[in-house]
Amino acid sequence: MKVGDIMSTNPQSVDVNEFVTHAREIMREYNYESLPVLDKGKVAGIITLQDIINVTSTRSDVTVNGYVRSSVPVLTPDVGLPRAAFIVVHTDEGRVPVVDSSSRLVGLLSINDIFKGLPELDLMDVPVSEYMTKKVVVCQPEDNLSRVWANMIEFGLTGLPVVNMKQEVIGMVTRGDVVKRGYARIERESPSGKTSTTVQKIMSTPAVTVEADDSIKVAAKIFTERNIGRVPVLYKNKLAGIIDRFDIIRACKVLQGVSAK
């Protein structure tokens, strides 16, 4: 399997001379974390929501050019799946542009696309605890949504577990939840303001979870069947960590020893 078999085609993009506010609107509307940036029709890099979220709407003359991450890797459609998967899981942007021989954008490859080839990558049968992240950014149901949204952007997270005082997981709130319900513009609201909203109003409950000693294949099946990207990990009914699609790909045998070169 090659990149051309699984990549997303006709991707959204922005030009280096377009305004940052326009790029941000596209990312909010489609719940994207990043967008390819073009210069004279060729890929110049990536712009991320994390980089531009704090550009105020009053600064309408700020262009994309000043925020381009030009050092991001690119792929071509003929690159094999193992190498492509390795590159995607080791990039901070989460999505990698796919270009033709003239450096023109022909697609995007994301972690979700990589999952289409998961059987070919030979996922190991190991406990979730071996690949989960143990230090988890969490929120509580009474937390102000503006602060939670800001944390998601700052740490580059697609969702946070919602826990009670006993560290029991009672729900999940995702960037998609925030965007779909129209709260993606509140990052500058005051927690004490009249328009403040709490997590409990939009969180999904009960949360989908896995146990620390479950096989990582159980988590992979959940991601595939439920189309979600992060799952809290429990040990003795308490939050012990979190596992995401990137962790799943890192646990594939085929990637062991693969390099980006």
Where do the protein language model's features map onto the residues?
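A glycine-centered beta-loop-beta connector
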Residues: M27, L35-T48, V88, V96-N112, ...
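Asp-centered catalytic/switch region of ABC-type ATPase nucleotide-binding domains
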Residues: I228
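Transmembrane alpha-helical segments that form core, pore/gating elements
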Residues: P141, S146-R147, G156-N164
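Acidic/glycine-rich phosphate/pyrophosphate-binding loops and surrounding catalytic core
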Residues: E93
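Tandem CBS (Bateman) regulatory domains
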Residues: M1-N10, T48-V74, L81, A85-V89, ...
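Hydrophobic, helix-prone linear segments
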Residues: M1-I47, V79-P82
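Short, surface-exposed recognition loops or helix-turn segments adjacent to catalytic cores
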Residues: D100, Y131-M132, Q140-E142, N164-M165
